[in-house]
């Protein structure tokens, strides 16, 4: 008999790839989704796999009982619902992220356990990993988003009784899907890169991965992940300079990427934050502190850790450049869109 997986957020970017891989590996797959405003084509019949039963439920407002009923009969659950750190909500940011990342997620996990789900995976952030291995940075104290990610993992493991819980901590992710525009365009590329002959950015490095390997991590966590474990997932460590130059190169544009002193990057970040505050917004990350303490250094998941996690969860490697190309082509499909 086929094992059955319920994916919360199956029409989202990461959930969609996880669902497709689960089908390919012979699982019976179902999805619970919110048809949010970011979904370009809400007619699922034209692009979403017909083998996947999709139910539209707002997991943030739904009752625990409603969610339990929806997950009855499933062996596994993958929770692929954001928001991530790139979303800037109305202040206070902590309340926004806590409700969505902690309260609502914990509700879904309780419902899954009541429904008889044996093992569940949550998509978390590599900021939680950095908070764990670099306590001197005090990331969860300074950034509401990081605090909520740490609280999410802690609560899911504290409240469980018989259901196994595996936490995946994700880095920068590249790739594309037909019915969504990559969030890269609105929150990053159009703001800081597109239309600028010279791009000023921070001198540090980060960890990156192609979305196909995120799907492998999700299924690998169900098949091989240890209960209670937190796995930092990634493929390659690259500098921001390389990333910006390669993204531009993908659209045939050569840009100068200059690395100004950190204090100048901090001033730029403070200007962005002032703009947010005037609109009553607050980021989940303190951008000035991120520029000063995170993006100005090579804050990466160590290669030996990446190797160990990829081996344990059976995650493939490579394809980063191709995934960046797909991202850029989806963001800017027409000649001249990216300058």
Model-derived features with residue positions:
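NAD(P)H-binding glycine-rich loop region in Rossmannoid oxidoreductase-like domains
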Residues: 52-103, 107, 129-131
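N-terminal Rossmann NAD(P)H-binding glycine-rich loop of SDR-like oxidoreductase domains
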Residues: 5-25
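Oxidoreductase cofactor-interface core, primarily capturing Rossmann-like NAD(P)-dependent enzymes
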Residues: 136-229, 234-236
